[in-house]
Amino acid sequence: RFAAMTRFSPVLPIAFGESRFQPVYVDDVARAAAEAAMGETAAGIYELGGPEVASFHDLMVMMLAEIRRHRLILNMPGWMARATARSLSVAQFMTAGLFTNSVLTLDQLRNLSHDTVVSPGARGFAELGISPTPMALILPTYLWRFRPAGQFEAIKESARNLNGA
């Protein structure tokens, strides 16, 4: 959603930019679930997180670098983000659903207001014998479409190399 916003806005507003996340690749989670379903793991609760921990702000910086766009990241204060979310929710209610608030909800703000990382000492991928996939391997596979030239960006870059030779 944030990558799509960069197509039409010079500013990327975020809330709680200091909150930390540990993004995980869905295929790694699916592999862990498959092993659990097959009875190949010890019973219990596992917290699954990727190999890197980054702040929400830093994740936005990584995304902007990957899509090759420069935007001002504006970290809104919590009160402003809550007011925005409430206003959007009221607009959805007042229009009887004609306007759907897919921009910012109070639930999203609650999730953003605290760290979402694996707890210290929690069982995770290591206990399952799975090495989680780094973000750098996955981000290009789905963010390329948000680059200025989309799927043709690689062609443009190779042509630029030919012209410079």
Tell where the protein language model's regions lie, with residue ranges.
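Conserved protein kinase catalytic domain
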Residues: 2-3, 60, 113, 139
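Residues at helix-coil transition
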Residues: 7, 38, 68, 140-144
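Substrate-binding strand-loop-helix patch
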Residues: 20-27, 46-66, 75-86, 131-133
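A hydrophobic C-terminal alpha-helical subdomain
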Residues: 79-165
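Core catalytic loop region at the nicotinamide-binding pocket of NAD(P)H-dependent oxidoreductases
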Residues: 36-50, 69-74, 101, 149
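A conserved pocket-lining segment of Rossmann-fold NAD(P)-dependent short-chain dehydrogenase/reductase
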Residues: 4-24, 28, 32-49
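Acceptor/aglycone-binding surface of glycosyltransferases and processive sugar-polymer synthases
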Residues: 1-12, 57, 65, 70-71, ...
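Hydrophobic "lid"/C-terminal helical patch
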Residues: 33-37, 63, 142
